[in-house]
């Protein structure tokens, strides 16, 4: 089951110290594809990176960084965009790429962004503040599509029951507020015991992932990193729930030689050669000291790959275990 990821984002970067240790030495040009509050970018600069390109699709994140980004001069360049196109933002081969997936603390903490089920705000959830909002999706998608989204993107077992309740509620009045949706979901599930996650956790995660096309963005971003990194360049990805971690884990497994050739006796070609090596035997999790300081880090996982000189290529999203919504009945 996917871990709760809606109460997870600290302003202090998660796993920063082990990340810097795993990718050392930090030098050359790095790209932070999920700039957010800039914690990883600053950490990379202070650890020795010559230059960092900070990319974020949230215009508010870049606006909030304007007050301090100038302190680094031309060592820090901010770019409005998505990390699925990070190779075009780079302009030249990179020495490293960092991706910190999912929703940020800033997005969760601002009620007006509509990500939180604990604060009343407009039902928005758009990271880029453009395109279809969560309210648009919740009020127009078919019951079947809503159930598929909740099940595949949130691993919500009560997906059919919740989808039916949403459709019944919106027939009376449009669902436009976060707490209104959270209440509809909560009524479909048992009251949680002390210490258990909020009943709306999985549903909010699923809707957010759908609104922001997070899984397709992730797969395309991993491919873009493979294209952008020079031989020896490092890819570091921090995940926060099992669905996205599975995609990253499988990508690195496959690209490090785990594709499984049809004939093991056939000569290896350049196209078959591993694109990454794996310096870590397994994912790194926060230690007790970090969890004591920052409980939101509890589900974080860090995975690292080192680029080889093999040519980049495309990857099949299904081979990565990417959850896919059936096309039938999407609207």
UniProtKB/Swiss-Prot annotation:
MF (Gene Ontology): rRNA (cytosine-N4-)-methyltransferase activity
Keyword annotations of the record: Cytoplasm, Methyltransferase, rRNA processing, S-adenosyl-L-methionine, Transferase
Main subcellular location of this protein, as a coarse class: cytoplasm
GO cellular component annotations of the record: cytoplasm
A Gene Ontology biological process term: rRNA base methylation
Known catalytic reactions: cytidine(1402) in 16S rRNA + S-adenosyl-L-methionine = N(4)-methylcytidine(1402) in 16S rRNA + S-adenosyl-L-homocysteine + H(+)
Keyword S-adenosyl-L-methionine attached: yes
Binding site for S-adenosyl-L-methionine: 38-40, 56, 83, 100, 107
Stretches assigned to coiled coil: none
Class in the EC hierarchy, top level: transferase
Keyword Methyltransferase attributed: yes
Renumbered residue ranges of the record's region Disordered: 287-331
Any Pfam family: Methyltransf_5
Localization (cell): Cytoplasm
EC code(s) of this entry: 2.1.1.199
Function field: Specifically methylates the N4 position of cytidine in position 1402 (C1402) of 16S rRNA.
PANTHER family from the UniProt entry: 12S RRNA N4-METHYLCYTIDINE METHYLTRANSFERASE (PTHR11265:SF0), S-ADENOSYL-METHYLTRANSFERASE MRAW (PTHR11265)
Family under the similarity heading: Belongs to the methyltransferase superfamily. RsmH family.
Protein name: Ribosomal RNA small subunit methyltransferase H
Organism: Cereibacter sphaeroides (strain ATCC 17023 / DSM 158 / JCM 6121 / CCUG 31486 / LMG 2827 / NBRC 12203 / NCIMB 8253 / ATH 2.4.1.)
